[in-house]
C-alpha cells in the first residue's frame, strides 16, 4: 500500500480581491494512483448571505492579476463538456465563521495537467446547471497552481 506523501505535488496560494481582502489560504494537489487529492484550507471568506457556500473551480489560465481576476479564463475543460462536468469543476466550499476546509479525490485530471492554471473562489454557490459556468457570481479569490 502506498502512503500519502506529506509534500503535495502542486499548491496554489489563495489571496482575496477587493470583495474579500482577508481571504487567504492554500489548495494542495497530491497525485494518487487513482486520481488527485485536492485539499483546500481557507480563512477570511465573507460571512454575508446568501449562504455559506462558495463555488470552487480550476480555471484555464494562471493569471490572478487585476481586480476581480479577469484574466483566469473559463473553467478548465479540455474535453469541451457542459457545466458541471468540466474537469475543473470541484465541490463547493462550505464556510463556517469565514473558514473552510475541503478534501476531495477527483479522477477528472492529473496534477501535471493543472500546473500553471488557477484556482478561483466565487462569491456565491454554483447552481450546477447554468451554462457555461454555474452562475456563481464574482471571483473573490485566486491562486496560481505551482509545482512544488
Please annotate each region the language model reported.
Residues 1-148:
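N-terminal leader/targeting pre-sequences
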Amino acid at each position: 500500500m502506498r502512503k500519502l506523501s506529506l509534500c503535495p505535488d502542486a499548491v496554489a496560494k489563495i489571496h482575496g480581491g477587493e470583495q474579500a481582502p482577508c481571504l487567504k489560504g492554500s489548495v494542495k494537489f497530491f497525485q494518487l494512483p487513482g486520481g488527485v487529492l485536492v485539499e483546500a484550507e481557507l480563512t477570511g471568506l465573507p460571512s454575508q448571505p446568501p449562504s455559506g457556500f462558495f463555488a470552487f473551480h480550476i480555471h484555464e489560465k494562471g493569471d490572478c492579476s487585476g481586480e476581480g481576476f479577469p484574466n483566469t479564463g473559463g473553467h478548465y475543460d479540455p474535453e469541451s463538456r457542459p457545466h458541471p462536468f468540466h474537469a475543473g469543476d470541484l465541490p463547493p466550499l462550505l464556510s463556517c465563521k469565514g473558514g473552510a476546509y475541503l478534501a476531495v479525490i477527483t479522477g477528472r485530471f492529473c496534477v501535471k495537467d493543472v500546473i500553471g492554471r488557477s484556482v478561483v473562489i466565487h462569491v456565491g454557490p454554483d447552481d450546477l446547471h447554468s451554462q457555461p459556468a454555474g452562475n456563481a457570481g464574482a471571483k473573490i479569490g485566486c491562486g496560481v497552481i505551482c509545482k512544488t
